[in-house]
């Protein structure tokens, strides 16, 4: 029998107030036919690949940490186009428009040969190789070994006009009811979002985790990350950013495979269920009391990965990238006349080994006690960018969205809302710091605060390195050819007529 029943589900009505719609920059930004080329100098850095080398008293850093497994976060600044000496001042009307830069091309140049650099720890927490065993591992108080390995191979860069957002797992706050019952227990974890700064470590095969807070043994990972937080770009959050400023586009290439299989030392935190509650031998059968297997070994297994082959056939660098359509609403507009380029690349990860004598004298025979070995890592970068000059109309609906997105942009354009002064005449004392006059005002005018001043970046100033002569630079010539802007050479017709030979008649 078919019966009619009323709908039991809830009825959802649209919200009464209108929902604000974020416009794409293509809807209100007018692009011009003026292009500039910007190129940095060679950017070089040298340091120790595993840690900072400090002075004897520890007060200063003598050799900084420079690892191939670090992020390089470049903050590139450009001149203000509204104060720029344009060759053609009829490009825009300063009374009704403002100028901004748009990134249309980028090439991240990398010097130095390809190479694999290893990392490790002289006291690495590994009991034994668990892939090929000949005898059962017994109990011991310290089984740490001197171990090294090559990291996961990573090539990656993220381009935007605000810093790249990273994510990592960290210790979470314990609930109030469990705060006094945490001895010997695994702490709760939470996913945290932080800005990726220059010098932060990326994942090399042990995960994006805060090793400093979650590894009390200081021997679970290699030396270069044991006191660091490994971060990974939060592509999901940046892709869903309403304005799309953090990531115009990105390129990523990661590869690894499990090379060695080890097990940790120490007691197992989460015991096997059979040993804990005797669940009818669902996981294993106990050994006889006379066997070594009677004392169950550790089951905290982990691999050390390898990045495998490094080849020039799979390089993301030293090649141009053209931006036609960004993944978000911001199609390459550089708000604040700056661009953030976050790079991760360990395919040029060679660590130099430098040896000297302990006393500084020449040696005639080898003696390891009289030799000191040093490690150094070097990196070389060069940034080339193609900029397009764009115009923004000073309309109410456009300024409203820009003000909601970032009010500092309007202040830079000198379009801030100026309140009506309370009194046109102000008091100005000449000797304000003397004892004869009143104390100075407690609130002093503050300089404009840099929203990213608390972060560490590799600052690259290109305010005086822009050029209209695109054909004088490698990336500029590639852009001219790619955009079809090259001038075709005229065909020169020869005025000399070639006389035809006399054709013989057949007889």
From Swiss-Prot:
<keyword id="KW-1145">T=7 icosahedral capsid protein</keyword>
<protein>
    <recommendedName>
        <fullName>Major capsid protein L1</fullName>
    </recommendedName>
</protein>
<keyword id="KW-1048">Host nucleus</keyword>
<comment type="subunit">
    <text>Self-assembles into homopentamers. The capsid has an icosahedral symmetry and consists of 72 capsomers, with each capsomer being a pentamer of L1. Interacts with the minor capsid protein L2; this interaction is necessary for viral genome encapsidation. Interacts with protein E2; this interaction enhances E2-dependent replication and transcription activation.</text>
</comment>
<comment type="function">
    <text>Forms an icosahedral capsid with a T=7 symmetry and a 50 nm diameter. The capsid is composed of 72 pentamers linked to each other by disulfide bonds and associated with L2 proteins. Binds to heparan sulfate proteoglycans on cell surface of basal layer keratinocytes to provide initial virion attachment. This binding mediates a conformational change in the virus capsid that facilitates efficient infection. The virion enters the host cell via endocytosis. During virus trafficking, L1 protein dissociates from the viral DNA and the genomic DNA is released to the host nucleus.</text>
</comment>
<dbReference type="GO" id="GO:0042025">
    <property type="term" value="C:host cell nucleus"/>
</dbReference>
<keyword id="KW-0946">Virion</keyword>
<feature type="region of interest" description="Disordered">
    <location>
        <begin position="122"/>
        <end position="147"/>
    </location>
</feature>
<dbReference type="GO" id="GO:0005198">
    <property type="term" value="F:structural molecule activity"/>
</dbReference>
<dbReference type="GO" id="GO:0039620">
    <property type="term" value="C:T=7 icosahedral viral capsid"/>
</dbReference>
<keyword id="KW-0945">Host-virus interaction</keyword>
<keyword id="KW-1161">Viral attachment to host cell</keyword>
<dbReference type="InterPro" id="IPR011222">
    <property type="entry name" value="dsDNA_vir_gr_I_capsid"/>
</dbReference>
<keyword id="KW-0426">Late protein</keyword>
<dbReference type="InterPro" id="IPR036973">
    <property type="entry name" value="Capsid_L1_sf_Papillomavir"/>
</dbReference>
<feature type="compositionally biased region" description="Polar residues">
    <location>
        <begin position="132"/>
        <end position="147"/>
    </location>
</feature>
<dbReference type="GO" id="GO:0019062">
    <property type="term" value="P:virion attachment to host cell"/>
</dbReference>
<keyword id="KW-1160">Virus entry into host cell</keyword>
<keyword id="KW-1015">Disulfide bond</keyword>
<keyword id="KW-0167">Capsid protein</keyword>
<keyword id="KW-1162">Viral penetration into host cytoplasm</keyword>
<dbReference type="GO" id="GO:0075509">
    <property type="term" value="P:endocytosis involved in viral entry into host cell"/>
</dbReference>
<dbReference type="Pfam" id="PF00500">
    <property type="entry name" value="Late_protein_L1"/>
</dbReference>
<dbReference type="InterPro" id="IPR002210">
    <property type="entry name" value="Capsid_L1_Papillomavir"/>
</dbReference>
<keyword id="KW-1164">Virus endocytosis by host</keyword>
<comment type="similarity">
    <text>Belongs to the papillomaviridae L1 protein family.</text>
</comment>
């Amino acid at each position: 029998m078919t019966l009619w029943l009323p709908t039991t589900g809830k009825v959802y009505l649209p919200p009464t107030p209108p929902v604000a719609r974020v416009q794409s920059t293509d809807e209100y930004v007018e692009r011009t036919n003026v292009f500039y080329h910007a190129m940095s100098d060679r950017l070089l850095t040298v340091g120790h690949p595993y840690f900072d080398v400090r002075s004897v008293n520890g007060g200063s850093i003598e050799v900084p940490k420079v690892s191939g497994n670090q992020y390089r976060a470049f903050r590139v600044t450009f001149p203000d186009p509204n104060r720029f000496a344009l060759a053609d001042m009829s490009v825009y009307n300063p009374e009704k428009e403002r100028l901004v830069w748009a990134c249309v091309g980028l090439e991240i140049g990398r010097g130095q040969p390809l190479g694999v650099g290893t990392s490790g720890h002289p006291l690495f927490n590994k009991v034994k190789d668990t892939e090929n065993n000949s005898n059962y591992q017994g109990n011991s108080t310290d089984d740490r070994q001197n171990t090294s390995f090559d990291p996961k191979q990573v090539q990656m860069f993220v381009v935007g006009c605000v810093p790249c957002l990273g994510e990592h797992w960290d210790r979470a706050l314990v609930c109030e009811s469990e705060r006094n019952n945490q001895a010997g227990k695994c702490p709760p974890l939470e996913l945290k979002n932080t800005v990726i700064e220059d010098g932060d470590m990326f994942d090399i095969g042990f995960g994006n985790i805060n090793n400093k807070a979650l590894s009390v043994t200081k021997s679970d990972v290699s030396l270069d990350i044991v006191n660091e937080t490994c971060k990974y770009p939060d592509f999901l959050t940046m892709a869903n950013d309403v304005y799309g400023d953090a990531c115009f586009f990105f390129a990523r290439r990661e590869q690894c495979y499990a090379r060695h299989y080890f097990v940790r030392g120490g007691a197992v935190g989460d015991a096997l269920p059979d040993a804990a509650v005797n669940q009818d031998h669902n996981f294993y059968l106990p050994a006889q009391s006379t066997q070594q297997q009677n004392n169950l070994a550790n089951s905290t297994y982990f691999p050390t990965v390898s990045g495998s082959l490094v080849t020039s056939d799979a390089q993301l660098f030293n090649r141009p990238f053209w931006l036609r359509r960004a993944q978000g609403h911001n199609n390459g507009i550089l708000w604040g006349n700056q661009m953030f380029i976050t790079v991760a690349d360990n395919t040029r990860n060679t660590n130099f080994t430098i040896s000297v004598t302990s006393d500084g004298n020449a040696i005639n025979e080898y003696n390891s006690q009289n030799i000191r070995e040093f490690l150094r890592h070097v990196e070389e970068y060069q940034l080339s960018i193609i900029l397009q000059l764009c115009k923004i109309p000073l309309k109410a609906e456009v300024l409203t969205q820009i003000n909601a997105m970032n009010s500092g942009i309007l202040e830079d354009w000198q379009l801030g809302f100026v309140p009506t002064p309370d009194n046109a005449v102000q008091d100005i004392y000449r000797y304000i710091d003397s004892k004869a006059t009143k104390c100075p005002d407690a609130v002093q005018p503050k300089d404009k605060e840099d929203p990213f001043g608390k972060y560490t970046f590799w600052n690259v100033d290109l305010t005086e390195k822009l050029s209209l002569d695109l054909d004088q630079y490698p990336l500029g010539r590639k852009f001219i050819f790619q955009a079809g802007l090259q001038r075709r050479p005229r065909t020169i017709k020869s005025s000399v007529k070639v006389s035809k030979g006399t054709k013989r008649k057949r007889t």
